[in-house]
Amino acid sequence: MTVRLTSLVKRHLGVDPEITGVTADSRKVKPGFLFAALPGSTVDGAAFAAKAVEAGAAAVIADLDLNLSVPTVVCRDPRRGYALAAANFWGRQPQTCVAVTGTNGKTSVANFCRQMFAGAGHASASMGTLGVTVSRPGEADLQVTPPGLTTPDAGDVAELLMHISRLGVTHFAMEASSHGIDQRRLDGVRLSAAGFLNLSQDHLDYHLTMDAYMKAKLRLFEQLMPRGATAVLNADNEAFPFFAAASVVSGQRVMSVGETGQALKLMERTLLPDGQRLKIRADGRMWDVRLPLAGAFQASNALVAAGLCRAAGLSFEDTFAGLERLNGAPGRLQRVGAGPRGGEAYVDYAHTPDGLETVLSALRPHVRGRLIVVFGAGGDRDKGKRPLMGEAAARLADVAIVTDDNPRSEVPAAIRADVLAGARGAKEIGDRREAIRAAAAMLEDGDILVVAGKGHEQGQIVAGVTHPFDDVEETAKALELVHG
């Protein structure tokens, strides 16, 4: 497969070599490739441009002329230039692409959309923290890539979109992380709709301020969505006015959802043993939806997913029928089992103050005894959220156990101390396996245990080494030990 350089960068150049591939990784360059020399926080891609040319690169994208023996395509924003060039190289994308952003809930919403698209008869796919999954009517789900980055590299995104298109996928939903948006990884995706869930403290190690964090997410609506596309916005979040204003100014149609929403208005929510019943006002009538998932946050996620499906062309009937058939995303309030004396154990991905508060608040109505939580905070990440997580756990759980959760290069005890500073009365058990076992041994009838932080992840990162560790597996083993 070859494409002329001018077709990729959409400008006239003195020369027009044939391009055989596009990458930002000099180690992957092959003869005929277009190499993107991207600026980075620690390493500048320009330092590897000469090496890329030696490996056969036919042209380079950079923010200044590098005086190489091959053409340099100078871009004021080389990351965006790379994303657009990759999209032009790989070409094909599903005809309907939607994205969702927010501090919490992106994985669930992307997965919900894929399930609902497939339920309506469309070959569909989702991309995000859980990898790329394809669902085709009448077939078992296909895992195209394993779990990894929430939003992959722009070149990988473009290639994956081409690949799933060849598999027949017509409807696609992806997570849009703040890192991914800021680093232009989604700039080549042709979006027809995007959703906003919520905004709370996270990733301040990268964005530094909440204002910068919000601006990164706003860019999805301000610059990545075309005029006339649909912005599906959670009206119940405090940041809603900012996202609504950005969407209106950008010429998008705003679809507000939630208790204070207009397009999909949640009128009533009733708890059920196996989920909840939602009364939703939409299209001038009331819809009674039995959602097989627990928690107010899942109702919110479901409404944003429903809005995205409506924006993608699904009927109200197919959309709400799809909500009633949903399966929760792995590691998202996932039930693991029960203790011998009763009590239920769950695993959840909650790793922010708001995420922890949301999960504990969702479980509280189902607790007849004690609510027990095992959690920690990650190393080399936003330190400001650690005491806030501790405060949320101590306030909302009856028993809080602080443990290790990917300490990375930091001293684990120091991270736990930061968390414990906000967690009055919490227990400290550094070894995560022992913490889970201690919590499982406490379970009595009416209790609920939630092991928070990792969700679907299957490793514990300590001093640069990833040790196998699966919260679901460890919680199940802990329950077995209690059973004897």
Residue ranges: model-predicted function:
Residues Y82-A235, P241-Q252, H366-V367, H483:
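Phosphate-binding loop of NTP-binding sites
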Residues A46-A47, Q183-R184, D205-A212, D382-K385, ...:
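Glycine/threonine-rich flexible loop motifs
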Residues M1-N88, T230, K265-L272, M286-D288, ...:
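N-terminal leader/targeting and accessory segments in enzymes
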Residues A58, S192, D398:
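Receiver (REC) domain switch/active-site residues of two-component response regulators
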Residues L38-V43, A329-G331, D354-R424, R432, ...:
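Active-site beta-alpha connecting loops in nucleotide-dependent enzymes
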Residues G40-S41, S178-H179, Q201-D202, N237-E238, ...:
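Short glycine-rich anion-binding loops that position phosphate/pyrophosphate groups of nucleotides
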Residues I448-L481:
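Glycine/aspartate-rich loop-and-adjacent alpha/beta segment that forms the canonical ThDP
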Residues L5, A62-S69, L167, A173, ...:
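Acidic, Mg2+-coordinating active-site environments of NTP-dependent enzymes
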